[in-house]
């Protein structure tokens, strides 16, 4: 059996899909379906069982035998960069991750988990997996950073796989439940379908992010599991592309409308990553040599998926 925490969420459900694609059906999804809309991410996927996150935590803390587990993909977390309840964030992202990690270590189960480029904070270069480059801007980034630090202490002595991925700006299918935290491509598509012009912040040609297609993220996860590689790795494309490029690709698909520029919100100033670009040196050195989709390629594929029933 393979366990995917956050399996009804964005990246988790895409990992389930990729596992299905290579023949895995014996999958336990762990999630919190208080937001019932997330069920749509699983309706076309095959899983063996579903367990509520709170019940799962109780089981692993109690040391229950969950059977023969081939791997745990730990994607379950609060991913809102605008959430400032630090206790909630640390319980969900830090303590929960430690509990799952130790369950896996005690049983030699491969543990692959979601970190984040938010660990780097507001820097505009040297996105390198090293302490000197890490200074998160928000409590979400801090919770991810602190768990990475915890893992770093354990890695040298670990006798089973521990692998963390610092996801950069992920977009693609199965993110609709994320609301305001969904990708720019998702929101631009909605605006066009509602008859509006797509909206970007003024200066968006200068805001550049490393946008990575979720299918590529899932492929990275599966490759590292199948190859038993441990460590903490950036998971981006190695390219910084502008929000304008995302809008251009969205408009190219719809072949209508033009961008409307709006003022940058005061509340985001100083807490906003204006630039991200993954350094892939360590990822490539580990042996992962597959190409990553460009924004033009990934957004075109995503638009086809989003508009398949529109």
Curated annotation (Swiss-Prot):
* Broad enzyme group: isomerase
Q: How is the cofactor bound?
A: Binds 1 NADP(+) per subunit.
Q: Please tell me where substrate binds in this chain.
A: 169, 180, 187, 201-204, 209, 272
Task: Please provide, alphabetically and separated by semicolons, the GO molecular function terms listed in this UniProt record.
Answer: ADP-glyceromanno-heptose 6-epimerase activity; NADP binding
Quote the Pfam families the UniProt record gives: Epimerase
Q: Which UniProt keywords apply?
A: Carbohydrate metabolism, Isomerase, NADP
Instruction: Point out the signal peptide segment.
Output: none
Reactions catalysed, as given in the entry:
ADP-D-glycero-beta-D-manno-heptose = ADP-L-glycero-beta-D-manno-heptose
Determine the domain of life of the protein's source.
Bacteria
List ligand-binding residues for NADP(+): 10-11, 31-32, 38, 53, 75-79, 92, 144, 170, 178
Please name the InterPro entries in this protein's record.
Epimerase_deHydtase, Heptose_epim, NAD(P)-bd_dom_sf
> Its GO biological process terms?
ADP-L-glycero-beta-D-manno-heptose biosynthetic process; carbohydrate metabolic process
> CDD domains annotated for this entry?
ADP_GME_SDR_e
Give the residues annotated as active site. Answer: 140, 178
Pathway linked to the protein: Nucleotide-sugar biosynthesis; ADP-L-glycero-beta-D-manno-heptose biosynthesis; ADP-L-glycero-beta-D-manno-heptose from D-glycero-beta-D-manno-heptose 7-phosphate: step 4/4
Enzyme Commission number, as recorded:
5.1.3.20
The cofactors required by this protein are:
NADP(+)
Describe its partners and assembly state: Homopentamer.
Q: What does this protein do?
A: Catalyzes the interconversion between ADP-D-glycero-beta-D-manno-heptose and ADP-L-glycero-beta-D-manno-heptose via an epimerization at carbon 6 of the heptose.
Q: What is known of its domains?
A: Contains a large N-terminal NADP-binding domain, and a smaller C-terminal substrate-binding domain.
Q: Which family does it belong to?
A: Belongs to the NAD(P)-dependent epimerase/dehydratase family. HldD subfamily.
Q: What is this protein called?
A: ADP-L-glycero-D-manno-heptose-6-epimerase
Instruction: Identify the species of origin.
Output: Pectobacterium atrosepticum (strain SCRI 1043 / ATCC BAA-672) (Erwinia carotovora subsp. atroseptica)
Lineage of origin? Bacteria, Pseudomonadati, Pseudomonadota, Gammaproteobacteria, Enterobacterales
